[in-house]
Each structure stands twice: as C-alpha cells, then as structure tokens.
Amino acid sequence: GIHAIFAAANAVSRLCMGHVDEETTFNIGTIQGGTATNIVPDCCVLTGEIRSYDHGKALETVRMTERIFTEEAQKINATAEVTSQIHLIAYETPLESKSVTDFQKACEILGFSGELTGTFGGSDNNSFAKNGIEGLVLSNGMYNAHSTREYTTVDDLYKGAELIGQLI
C-alpha cells in the first residue's frame, strides 16, 4: 500500500522549522496516522502554524509547504491536501500613538523599564488593529514560552496588575 506517514515524514524533513527568518516562524505541532502496527497507514494528518510580521511571507510559506507535501506525495503515488486558515494578520502600533505614550508614562511613574518589543504572539489586539483600533499587548512575563517548561512568576503578575491600575 501507499505509506502516508512515509510521505509526510519526507515532506516534514524538507521544511525549515522554528525561526525561518527574523520575521517568520513555522512549526508542525501534531502528526496523526495509522490504525495498527501491522497495517500500512493510508492517511496521515499534520497540523502546524506559520507566524510572520510580514503577511506576504506567511502566505509564501503556506505555498511552499503545499508544494513540498505535493511533491513528496507524488513520489509514492499518493495525494496531499493542504488546507490553511488565516487566524490573524500582523500589525504594528506607531510609536507616537496614544497607546504607546500612555504605556511609557505609566511605566515611568512605576519605575518599570517599559520596553517595547515585537512578538509572534496573537491576541485580540490583532482584530482591533485590523479594524483600525490602535493598542498594545501587555505581556504577563512568560519564561520558556511555548515549551513544556513555560511559567511566570507571582511578582510579574503583581507588576502587571500594578501597570493596569496605573493605565486605568
């Protein structure tokens, strides 16, 4: 039979995972296939995500992924179906916006550094920005983010609450 996991594994081995470049990340997070150890798996389903500060690069990575899976499937007379959903589009809040200046002022009052950074994370703010509403995402201070060792501290949570109080 046609070994779907074999084709999928070959495709995954050709993909660049993690930080593809400074603006884009790519991850295959789940792989499911097969029904028993003595049966050739005729289906394999993978899920993953692409995040990028540049929407065009995200779409380009989707097209590249589809091409690679199709090529590897064709090598063993299988088929590949790649579906994608756009959950969010990257945005940038201007440094001169009221959101930024209010944030920096609150941080100064509290003695916090008020560091502005980019993030590959998604939030409700992506939807707000898409609809012309400027804002910032205030981090809860995650360590080892998106790993099995992810955590935060009570102190970081407390400081976050202080900052929110100052902004209100």
Placement of each model-derived feature along the sequence:
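Generic alpha-helical structural signal
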Residues: 9, 59, 63-66, 101-104, ...
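Midchain, well-structured core segments that form catalytic/ion-binding scaffolds
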Residues: 1-92, 119
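Zn-dependent metallopeptidase/amidohydrolase metal-coordination segment
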Residues: 31, 112-163
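Active-site-adjacent substrate-binding region
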Residues: 9-19, 62, 88-136
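A short, structure-level motif marking secondary-structure boundaries and short turns
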Residues: 54-55, 87-89, 108-111, 146, ...
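Short, conserved glycine- and acidic-residue-centered signature motifs
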Residues: 1-4, 96, 150-157
